[in-house]
């Protein structure tokens, strides 16, 4: 599932390419047809992201809300000059076309039209987003320090911190030597403060570079990444491999429905 930095990159791209002008919105698949017709030809005021949620805000008060889920993707394309639009490929839930570019949305978990009150309701259920300037770490700390749940589960809870996915969760805990099964209330305030600052920095790098880069330069060598074109990780998808720092075998288990990875020596 795309993590928060990906949605912020999409919001910035759509802001740059489409905001401030009328756009054509359609639903080749048909499932979003009625909502698409409501904003077709309207001016896109701005695009924004909160955690893993993307919002297209239109002049007039309507907002398209998208959550990509596990399988959703946007495909961006340049509009052919003086030519017919390219035929949709696959099940395109929403197509948005501006003066120079178009984008096709496929496979989202959510693609819906909301009014301002409904947008506020969605956001009210989310924790602070580390990539937003208004993010207040006091909110997640207040929840975490009272909880018996494992910190590895709390970091993935979007009502506590919005935008953290499985890669950032596992890698952040390794970087700070925290066992993912340690209870939230056993996390020290200084530990959390340092981890929050690091999380903000890491996600900003992801936003800027378009990749999740978490391995420090002094450890960025040796065994290759878990996938082609992916930067190295410390623990994510490295179960059975030696730790890049101490050599201990990386472990994995299921934690609240998602795989967690950790080094039993480096993380306590």
Role assignments for model-derived ranges:
Residues 1-268:
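Structured catalytic/nucleic-acid-binding cores of DNA maintenance enzymes
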């Amino acid at each position: 599932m795309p993590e928060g930095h990906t949605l912020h990159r999409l919001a910035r791209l759509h802001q740059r390419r489409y905001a401030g002008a009328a756009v054509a919105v359609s639903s080749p698949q048909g499932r979003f047809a009625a909502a698409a017709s409501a904003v077709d030809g309207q001016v896109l005021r701005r695009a924004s992201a909160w955690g893993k949620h993307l919002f297209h805000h239109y002049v007039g008060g309507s907002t398209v809300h998208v959550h990509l889920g596990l399988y959703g993707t946007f495909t961006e394309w340049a509009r052919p000059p003086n030519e017919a639009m390219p035929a949709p490929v696959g099940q395109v839930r929403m197509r948005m076309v501006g003066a120079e570019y178009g984008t096709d949305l496929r496979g989202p978990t959510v693609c819906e039209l909301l009014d301002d009150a409904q947008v506020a309701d969605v956001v009210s259920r989310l924790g602070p987003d580390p990539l937003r300037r208004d993010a207040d770490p006091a909110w997640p700390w207040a929840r975490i320090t009272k909880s018996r749940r494992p910190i590895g589960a709390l970091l993935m809870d979007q009502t506590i911190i919005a935008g953290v996915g499985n890669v950032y969760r596992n890698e952040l805990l390794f970087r700070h030597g925290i066992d993912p099964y340690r209870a939230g209330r056993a996390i020290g305030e200084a530990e959390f403060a340092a981890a929050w600052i690091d999380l903000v920095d890491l996600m900003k790098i992801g936003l800027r570079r378009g990749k999740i880069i978490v391995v420090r330069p002094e450890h960025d060598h040796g065994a290759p990444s878990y996938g082609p074109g992916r930067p190295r990780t410390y623990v994510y998808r490295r179960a059975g491999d030696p730790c890049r720092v101490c050599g201990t075998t990386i472990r994995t288990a299921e934690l609240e429905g998602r795989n967690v990875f950790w080094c039993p020596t480096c993380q306590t």
